[in-house]
Amino acid sequence: MAEKLHISVLCGGQSTEHEISIQSAKNIVNTLDAAKYLISVIFIDHVGRWYLIDQPEMFLAHSPDHLVKEGSARPITIAFGDAAKPWQSLNGDGRRYSADCVFPMVHGTQGEDGALQGLLELLNLPYVGANVQSSAVCMEKDLTKTVLRAGGIPVVDWHTLSPRDATEGVYQRLLDRWGTSELFVKAVSLGSSVATLPVKTETEFTKAVKEVFRYDDRLMVEPRIRGREIECAVLGNGAPKASLPGEIIPHHDYYSYDAKYLDPNGATTTTSVDLSESVTKQIQQIAIDAFKMVHCSGMARVDFFVTPNNKVLVNEINTIPGFTNISMYPKMWEASGLPCPNLLDQLIELAIDRHQEQQKLIRCYEVKARSL
C-alpha cells in the first residue's frame, strides 16, 4: 500500500478575505480523500501568527480562533533546512512537523500576491497553484491587463491612479473617453470585490477614490460593462485545459462582497450557460491563452464580460479561486465531468510534478576564478 502524502492546507492570513479563506479551506479539508492523504491545517491569524491544526475533524467542527483559544491549534514557526519538516513547534519541545505538499488557500494580500509562494519556494516545498511571478502579476490587476493587452488578449479598458495623482477633472476625462458616466472604482490588488465601488457622478467618484485609497495605494477605474458575467476555470501546467463556462447573475446592483458571501440571495450562479458553441469555444481558448500569457500553473479562474453583441472581454485572473461549497471554480469542473475530489488530486499531482521539474534546473553555476 502506498504511503499517504501529507498535505498542509494553509488558510486565514492578514487579508480582507480572511474569513473566505477559512471557508475555502474547510471545503478542501472535507473533500480531500483521507484514504490517500494525511491532512493538516496551517492557520494564520489576523496578526500573522501561525498555528498547526493536525486534527482535521476539529477544524471542520470549530472556528480556528476557537481552536487557538482552547489550545488545539499549536503555535508554530517556519523551520528552514529540512523541506520534509517545515513547521516547528513553539511550545518548547522544538518538534518539527512534515508536509509533502502545501495547498495555499490564503486569498488576497500576502497569500495570493507571491509573498506566500516565495516563502514556500525558500522552503523548497511543492505547492498548489501559480508561482511567485505569476501570482504577483495576477494580483496587480492593472499589470495583468497590461500584459494581456500586449499579448493581444481583449480586456476591459482601465485607468490607474495613485494617491499622488491629481483627481480633478479625471472623471470628466474618463466619461469623454468611454462615453458613459457609469464607472467602477476598485483597488488594484484586492479580491472578492473588496473596495470595489460603482459611481455615476463626479461627487460619487471623488468619494469612492478616497474610500478605496483606505485599502490600497493604487486604484483603477473601469467603465461599467453592461454584459453577462462569465467565468472559466483553467487547470494544468504546460498543457492547460479549460472547463465549461459558468455565469454569475447578481441580484444586487453588482456582484459585491455582500452579494458573494453575506446575502444568500445575492446572486445566482449557474454552470448551465446559454451561450453559442462559438462563443463558448472562444471563452475557453482566451482563458487558456491568458493563463499561458502570465505563466500560470496549477489552477486559475478567468473572469469575463460578454457584451450584448457577444464581444468577449477578460476582466481579471484569479490564481487562488474560491473553493467554498458554492464557489464557481470547483463547480465548473464538476459540470465538465471532473468531481471535486478528483480535481484536488490533480492539483496536488500538478504541484508535485512542477516541483520535480524545477529540481532538475541548474541553480548554481560555478565559475573558477582566473588566476592573476
Curated annotation (Swiss-Prot):
E.C. number: 6.3.2.4
GO BP annotations listed: cell wall organization; peptidoglycan biosynthetic process; regulation of cell shape
Listed PROSITE patterns: ATP_GRASP, DALA_DALA_LIGASE_1, DALA_DALA_LIGASE_2
Positions bound to Mg(2+) 1: D303, E316
Family matches, as Pfam families: Dala_Dala_lig_C (PF07478), Dala_Dala_lig_N (PF01820)
Family: Belongs to the D-alanine--D-alanine ligase family.
Protein name in UniProt: D-alanine--D-alanine ligase
Organism annotation: Coxiella burnetii (strain RSA 493 / Nine Mile phase I)
